[in-house]
Amino acid sequence: MKMRSPLLIAAVATLGLGAFVARAEAKKPAAPAAASNGFQTDFLGLLDDVQKKILSLEDAIPQDKFKWRPSPGVRSVSEAFLHIAYGNYGFTKGATGKAPPADVGWGTDHAKWDAKTTDKAEIKKTLEASFDQVRAAMKDVQDADLDKKVNVFGHDMTERAVWMALLGHLNEHMGQEVAYARANNVVPPWSMPKGG
């Protein structure tokens, strides 16, 4: 009969003991999940990214292009930026039930809102205030409430879906503004070659 190496025996015993412990651990009841703000963290990270891009694009497009529109009946540069802010307030109201501050003049007539100014500085302030409103509202969001049903713009959906739709709306209209910028020979700042 051959003698087994003590090292081999020790390795096999260790593996066997490890498997036994792993099975025992797997049978233990799971610890209660810690309070999480995972959605909030993810959402705010995505919001920061799209906000920086939108504001940098608004900065890059010259004031004399803010009345430009690709064709009659389509939003102009200024109207599209204001529409972004309108959506920020509208989706936030839909998710939280809280109306935007009275002094912003938000209402149900988005065409009137979109056409309220073509002044670049005013539009930037409006955009920044709308992003601040979204961010402040998101800080109160709890993961446990995200499946709560709400009605937004006549549609029943979860609170989570409203926040996701807000991000979708931001990206849709950022893309619109990118097309407008490029049609006017403005390169989106984040697309410029590095170092020059």
Regions found by a protein language model. Give the residues of each.
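Bacterial N-terminal signal peptides that target proteins for export
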Residues: 1-10
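Bacterial N-terminal signal peptides
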Residues: 9-19
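Short, contiguous alpha-helical
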Residues: 44-48, 55, 65-108, 151-196
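Short, helix-capping/interhelical loops that line the mouth of catalytic, cofactor-
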Residues: 25-42, 87-152, 184-196
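Sec/Tat signal peptide C-region and signal peptidase I cleavage site
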Residues: 20-24
